[in-house]
Structure formats: C-alpha cells, structure tokens
Amino acid sequence: MVRIQRRKLLASCLCVTATVFLLVTLQVMVELGKFERKEFKSSSLQDGHTKMEEAPTHLNSFLKKEGLTFNRKRKWELDSYPIMLWWSPLTGETGRLGQCGADACFFTINRTYLHHHMTKAFLFYGTDFNIDSLPLPRKAHHDWAVFHEESPKNNYKLFHKPVITLFNYTATFSRHSHLPLTTQYLESIEVLKSLRYLVPLQSKNKLRKRLAPLVYVQSDCDPPSDRDSYVRELMTYIEVDSYGECLRNKDLPQQLKNPASMDADGFYRIIAQYKFILAFENAVCDDYITEKFWRPLKLGVVPVYYGSPSITDWLPSNKSAILVSEFSHPRELASYIRRLDSDDRLYEAYVEWKLKGEISNQRLLTALRERKWGVQDVNQDNYIDAFECMVCTKVWANIRLQEKGLPPKRWEAEDTHLSCPEPTVFAFSPLRTPPLSSLREMWISSFEQSKKEAQALRWLVDRNQNFSSQEFWGLVFKD
C-alpha cells in the first residue's frame, strides 16, 4: 500500500512538473509571438526578407532534443531567456525553449528576432555562411558562432583568418575548436573493436582469386585532394577494384548503387572481403577525418589513407593504417602493398590491434570519452544540440559576470579552428595524367579568390554597416 501511495505521489509530481513546464513554454511562445508579429511589420533586415527560410534537409537525420524539464525555482520572466538565433535555418525550429544543464535559452530560426533585446547570439552553419545577408550592425552583446563539420570545399572563405576570427565560438572538425567534431564519424570504441564484419585472412586469400587486393569506392570525382589522379596512376602498378562513379571498373549490385547504401549491411559485407581499401579524403586538412577512414577500421580492412596530415594522432594503434604520405610515388606504394599481400605475417601486423581488441591511442580514447555528444545514440545529445548548449552556457556565464559588475569574457576563434592548405594537384606521368579539367582547375583558383573574399568580408563586417553584394564584389575585384 505504501509503495502504491508513493507511486501515485510521484506520478502527481511528474504531472505537475510537466504542466508547469508546458505553461511556461506556452507563455514564452506567446510573448515572443507578440514581438514577432510586431517585428514582422517593421523589420529592417538588410536584405529586406521577413519570411522565414526553409531548413536544409541534409541534416534531418539528427533528432533534436525536446525542451527539457523546467527549473521551477527560477522566477519566470520573458527577459530571463537569452535568444539564440540560427541565422542559417539549419534546425527548422521556429522556436524552442531548450534546457542546457542549469541554463535555458530560446532557440529559433526566425530572423524577426534580430532586434529583440534578449537576442544574444547568432548561430551560423558554415556551408551556408555567405554575404547575402548578415546580422549587421553587430551590437556589442551579439556573439557569433559557427558550426562547420563538412568538407572545406563547401566554403573556402571560412578557412582564412579574417573570416574565422569573426566568430566567438566554433564547432568544427578541428581539435582546436571550442567544440571539436573530429570524431564525428566514429560511433564508439566498441565498433572499432567489433569483429562482426571481419573476414578471416585465410578467406581473404582465397577471395584474392577474383578480387583485387585494393578496393576504391568514390563517386565525388575530382575533388580538391585530387585523389582520382593518384589512384589512376596507382592502377598502372597494382590491381584496384573501383566500384564508384570515379574510375569505375566494377559494379555494385543494383540495390547498393544508391549512395544511401554506403552504410548498408550488404555494402559492408562486400568491402570487408578486401585486404586493403583506398581511403582518400576529398580535401587535405588537419583533423578532417571522415567515414572513409573509420569504415575500413570497423570492417577489418586496412586503410591506405590520404587526407589529414595529423592522422597519426587518431590511429587506433601505431600500425593500423598505411599512410600514402610516407611514399614518394604510387609505384612505391604498390610495391609495399604487394609485399604485404603475399606475406600473411606482415599483413596481420596491421590488424593485430583489432584481433586483440586493443586500442593504444590514448588521445583517441580520451576524445571519445570526453566528447559531449554522441553518434547515432538516442541516449546522448547529437552534436547540434551540444553546439547550441555550448553557446547558451557561455552566454549565460557572461550574463552572470555582468550581473556582478564584472566585464564579460571575450571569446574569439583562432585560425587553427579551421586549417587547410591550398589545394594541389598530382602530376606523375605526362602520358597518363589527364590535362587539368575545369573542375580540377577550379579548386585552386577558388581557394585563391577566397582569400580576397575573406579580406573584403572582414573589412565590411568591421565597418559594421549593411552592405550590398555589389559593394562586396567590388572590393574583391578591386585590383
């Protein structure tokens, strides 16, 4: 009987808590809605747009967390909640009161809150960051934060100091950012140790009668890393099975040709049969490490890696991948792979860590243990939630400093938060290397122009006035 009464009491408390939270959230929405309607009529956005933009669809797979339990001890007032305005309509949320630990912030994509006195931070999605409309003039209490987990080729302007230092807070693939996303494609240590897809070496040796030692799967051809040129040259020295649109010489089953099938069990089973995989990133940047590296490690295939110069900091063990950068020419790389292919003892040295389930890299272990978000884990926040809460928490910290009469802490991004060298192209044999295509040429010229764009944008933002695209491009091509 006592247990039943306790359960009833607990249920009653939960109902009361939920009711209070719903009422508070509703009141916030009503009050902000009044402001929104007022601003909708008299908005002075620089581009003249007052209509809310649609959210992009490429991140729809990330589930947003709902508003969490409201702290009833804090006296509710509309002015109690800093507004975090997504200037890029990434989340698609017109308004949500989100709890971040002991703090709460109002998150929205609605630009009519630009002039609200409680708007404290503007959140940008790196790929969508452009000069068409920026929240200018920028007030002293307006923080800017950028979230950029995608390829550098999507927006080169961000990779130059004049632009990246416009932001107060960053979430990027760099370990140096305020919220590092370096391991964004790695679910957990357990998936690295898993033997689920591992094909025994004896079986792989038998499969070699019909399979090449190397496999290559890419459909994004001629990216800034110029990987296709390298692989094309490599193919003249060793057999490579290429399944993607780039350099294709082998076909996947029809049901696996869709790019969405790259994480399908059937695709994994095919790739796991190979001894080696060419894991080439589409761009060369410190800490830019994608599924191209982690996938083969999960499947028990040795990655032949080209991409992040800092990849050795993230290897599960010292001998878990073959690094292209250690070979002066594809011919030498091919010779080394043939040697491993013919010597089981040498090959097994690269998968020993997986067979034993031993990961010796403490940096990797620490990064996964301490990151504040999860990958495909319903029990953890995703990295967008973590980014929002990072900004919310830092904004609140400064509010509390000011309440004590102290100056707020000034946060600023550094150029190390996104670091990529200028793209280069491979040039091996003049007879086999194709002439520079328009796409291959584009990455180099685009990077060069982005330097001028970054300088022009910085000058205009520092001027702190609205500007037109004509004014921007006039500065870019001034010389």
From Swiss-Prot:
<feature type="glycosylation site" description="N-linked (GlcNAc...) asparagine">
    <location>
        <position position="110"/>
    </location>
</feature>
<dbReference type="Pfam" id="PF17039">
    <property type="entry name" value="Glyco_tran_10_N"/>
</dbReference>
<dbReference type="GO" id="GO:0000139">
    <property type="term" value="C:Golgi membrane"/>
</dbReference>
<keyword id="KW-0328">Glycosyltransferase</keyword>
<dbReference type="GO" id="GO:0005764">
    <property type="term" value="C:lysosome"/>
</dbReference>
<dbReference type="InterPro" id="IPR031481">
    <property type="entry name" value="Glyco_tran_10_N"/>
</dbReference>
<dbReference type="GO" id="GO:0006457">
    <property type="term" value="P:protein folding"/>
</dbReference>
<keyword id="KW-0333">Golgi apparatus</keyword>
<keyword id="KW-0812">Transmembrane</keyword>
<dbReference type="GO" id="GO:0097150">
    <property type="term" value="P:neuronal stem cell population maintenance"/>
</dbReference>
<dbReference type="InterPro" id="IPR001503">
    <property type="entry name" value="Glyco_trans_10"/>
</dbReference>
<dbReference type="GO" id="GO:0036071">
    <property type="term" value="P:N-glycan fucosylation"/>
</dbReference>
<dbReference type="GO" id="GO:0005789">
    <property type="term" value="C:endoplasmic reticulum membrane"/>
</dbReference>
<dbReference type="GO" id="GO:0006605">
    <property type="term" value="P:protein targeting"/>
</dbReference>
<feature type="disulfide bond">
    <location>
        <begin position="389"/>
        <end position="392"/>
    </location>
</feature>
<dbReference type="InterPro" id="IPR017176">
    <property type="entry name" value="Alpha-1_3-FUT_met"/>
</dbReference>
<dbReference type="GO" id="GO:0008417">
    <property type="term" value="F:fucosyltransferase activity"/>
</dbReference>
<dbReference type="GO" id="GO:0021799">
    <property type="term" value="P:cerebral cortex radially oriented cell migration"/>
</dbReference>
<keyword id="KW-0458">Lysosome</keyword>
<keyword id="KW-0256">Endoplasmic reticulum</keyword>
<dbReference type="GO" id="GO:0005783">
    <property type="term" value="C:endoplasmic reticulum"/>
</dbReference>
<protein>
    <recommendedName>
        <fullName>GDP-fucose protein O-fucosyltransferase 3</fullName>
        <ecNumber>2.4.1.221</ecNumber>
        <ecNumber>2.4.1.-</ecNumber>
    </recommendedName>
</protein>
<comment type="similarity">
    <text>Belongs to the glycosyltransferase 10 family.</text>
</comment>
<dbReference type="GO" id="GO:0006486">
    <property type="term" value="P:protein glycosylation"/>
</dbReference>
<dbReference type="GO" id="GO:0050714">
    <property type="term" value="P:positive regulation of protein secretion"/>
</dbReference>
<dbReference type="Pfam" id="PF00852">
    <property type="entry name" value="Glyco_transf_10"/>
</dbReference>
<dbReference type="GO" id="GO:0036065">
    <property type="term" value="P:fucosylation"/>
</dbReference>
<dbReference type="GO" id="GO:0042355">
    <property type="term" value="P:L-fucose catabolic process"/>
</dbReference>
<keyword id="KW-0325">Glycoprotein</keyword>
<keyword id="KW-1133">Transmembrane helix</keyword>
<dbReference type="GO" id="GO:0009312">
    <property type="term" value="P:oligosaccharide biosynthetic process"/>
</dbReference>
<comment type="pathway">
    <text>Protein modification; protein glycosylation.</text>
</comment>
<dbReference type="GO" id="GO:0007399">
    <property type="term" value="P:nervous system development"/>
</dbReference>
<dbReference type="InterPro" id="IPR038577">
    <property type="entry name" value="GT10-like_C_sf"/>
</dbReference>
<keyword id="KW-0735">Signal-anchor</keyword>
<feature type="topological domain" description="Cytoplasmic">
    <location>
        <begin position="1"/>
        <end position="8"/>
    </location>
</feature>
<keyword id="KW-1015">Disulfide bond</keyword>
<dbReference type="GO" id="GO:0009566">
    <property type="term" value="P:fertilization"/>
</dbReference>
<keyword id="KW-0472">Membrane</keyword>
<dbReference type="GO" id="GO:0030097">
    <property type="term" value="P:hemopoiesis"/>
</dbReference>
<feature type="glycosylation site" description="N-linked (GlcNAc...) asparagine">
    <location>
        <position position="168"/>
    </location>
</feature>
<dbReference type="GO" id="GO:0005794">
    <property type="term" value="C:Golgi apparatus"/>
</dbReference>
